[in-house]
UniProtKB/Swiss-Prot annotation:
Span(s) of short sequence motif Unconventional nuclear localization signal: 1-18
Keywords, sorted A to Z: Capsid protein, Helical capsid protein, Host nucleus, Host-virus interaction, Ribonucleoprotein, RNA-binding, Viral nucleoprotein, Viral penetration into host nucleus, Virion, Virus entry into host cell
HAMAP family, sorted: INFV_NCAP
Family classification: Belongs to the influenza viruses nucleoprotein family.
Superkingdom of this protein's organism: Viruses
The protein's name: Nucleoprotein
A biological process term (GO) from this entry: symbiont entry into host cell
Subunit: Homomultimerizes to form the nucleocapsid. May bind host exportin-1/XPO1. Binds to viral genomic RNA. Protein-RNA contacts are mediated by a combination of electrostatic interactions between positively charged residues and the phosphate backbone and planar interactions between aromatic side chains and bases.
Region (Disordered): 1-21
Length: 498
């Protein structure tokens, strides 16, 4: 990409960004991981969790949610001002699972937010350590991306459920900052913009007055983030049009949906990071590993090595398959919900199946679920190979894809051709090429028509043996192209509900 030099790497986004060299970045990311680990150890002590209970991913999720809630300034302010019955705005908590007399019991805990903030800051050398919080948000977002298909949300904004490969990060909170913006897919950005424009259409004052000015600058900022994800001049020019509109309305929504569709073939650049649950970092820190000293990267071998040596457990419902639960979490750990399943199977060393074939529901257990028959089992999060995460959409390419998901958004920088169902995508581009953006539309359609099946993305890039820490011997995988490549194939994944 031409503008590569002006962009900050996502490690720089993670680290509030002065230009740092690789060693400083690795130390800085390591420091963030140390903080999360120390916090988790302290919380396990507070909650009197055994080692096994502390490694239970459901307990990890509760603890992560508690600290995120304790630092959610806007929501905390809102709760103070709009008290609701039975909810203490100063407290946060959730279900903690303990092993009592040979069975799993659920216990609801409640803590002062102030106390949680104190423990968090203490674990992070007195800092608010926003980066660590964002890191946990991205882990939750990646888990949601792997667990749920956002069909309803897509349909509500006038998009097509088959565009789900563009929806990475769709459940990230708005406060997730630059690191959060980096991992949002094209569809996620488009959806946020469409919601904004719709509010403007329905509420005359949305763009007006003091607040309207803030709204407008947020709108333009989001347009610029989206523009920065596109890799072709025509798509970017289209975003300039949308951004400069005097009074954003249906024409802009049309343009946005058009550009989202085009991203199925002319893919945008979306960052991928392996963000692991706190219960992975905690035990590593308590075993004496010093992440800051050793250095850590979210996009290299480090998360793979960490998972090779970690024991994580999960509660399993009576009719769930533990191997399937493991796949779900493994994909979430590597931000791989929209990657080609053939490549994932190769890296993981065991077959990775589409969501609809997995006998597993989400990782979190609802408060009304019966605990009587809950078992627990070890999550298998190890891999056969490792590969470098990508921030590029790769070139585009077509091939038989599936009824559900009709494109992929690559996670790993590994040579392959990227599947998409060209005829299906192109069918959506008949008709409307008039209006202000007609020349851009024509240009975009021309480029999509020209996308070639034999074109290879990430040429020469391969996966690496886990012993090859310096990435010296790339192994270029060969795939059985007759297999299904899409995760949300013909989908019967549950919907994500807030």
């Amino acid at each position: 990409m031409a503008s590569q030099g002006t962009k900050r790497s996502y490690e720089q986004m993670e680290t509030d960004g002065e230009r740092q060299n690789a060693t400083e970045i690795r130390a800085s990311v390591g420091k963030m991981i140390d903080g999360i680990g120390r916090f988790y150890i302290q919380m396990c002590t507070e909650l009197k969790l055994s080692d096994y209970e502390g490694r239970l991913i459901q307990n990890s999720l509760t603890v992560e949610r508690m600290v995120l809630s304790a630092f959610d300034e806007r929501r905390n302010r809102y709760l103070e001002e709009h008290p609701s019955a039975g909810k203490d705005p100063k407290k946060t908590g959730g279900p903690i699972y303990k092993r009592v007399g040979g069975r799993w019991m659920r216990e609801l805990v409640l803590y002062d937010k102030e106390e949680i903030r104190r423990i968090w800051r203490q674990a992070n050398n007195g800092d608010d350590a926003t980066r660590g919080l964002t890191h946990m948000m991205i882990w939750h977002s990646n888990l949601n991306d792997t667990t749920y298909q956002r069909t309803r949300a897509l349909v509500r904004t006038g998009m097509d459920p088959r565009m789900c490969s563009l929806m990475q990060g769709s459940t990230l909170p708005r406060r997730s900052g630059a690191a959060g913006a980096a991992v949002k897919g094209i569809g996620t950005m488009v959806m946020e913009l469409i919601r904004m424009i719709k509010r403007g259409i329905n509420d005359r004052n949305f763009w007006r007055g003091e607040n309207g000015r803030k709204t407008r600058s947020a709108y333009e900022r989001m347009c610029n983030i989206l523009k920065g994800k596109f890799q072709t001049a025509a798509q970017r020019a289209m975003m300039d049009q949308v951004r400069e509109s005097r009074n954003p309305g249906n024409a802009e929504i049309e343009d946005l949906i058009f550009s989202a569709r085009s991203a199925l073939i002319l893919r945008g650049s979306v960052a991928h990071k392996s963000c692991l649950p706190a219960c992975v970092y905690g035990p590593a820190v308590s075993s004496g590993y010093d992440f800051e000293k050793e250095g850590y990267s979210l996009v290299g071998i480090d998360p793979f090595k960490l998972l090779q040596n970690s024991q994580v457990y999960s509660l399993i419902r009576p009719n769930e398959n533990p191997a399937h639960k493991s796949q779900l979490v493994w994909m979430a750990c590597h931000s791989a919900a929209f990657e080609d399943l053939r490549l994932l199977s190769f890296i993981r060393g065991t077959k990775v199946s589409p969501r609809g074939k997995l006998s597993t529901r989400g990782v979190q257990i609802a408060s009304n679920e019966n605990m009587d028959n809950m078992e627990s089992s070890t999550l298998e999060l190890r891999s056969r190979y490792w590969a470098i995460r990508t921030r590029s959409g790769g070139n585009t390419n077509q091939q038989r894809a599936s009824a559900g998901q009709i494109s992929v958004q690559p996670t790993f920088s590994v040579q392959r051709n990227l599947p998409f169902e060209k005829s299906t995508v192109m069918a959506a581009f008949t008709g409307n090429t008039e209006g202000r953006t007609s020349d851009m539309r024509a240009e975009i359609i021309r480029m999509m028509e020209g996308a070639k099946p034999e074109e290879v993305s990430f040429r020469g890039r391969g996966v690496f043996e886990l012993s090859d820490e310096k990435a010296t011997n790339p192994i270029v995988p060969s795939f059985d192209m007759s297999n299904e490549g899409s995760y949300f194939f013909g989908d019967n994944a549950e919907e994500y509900d807030n």
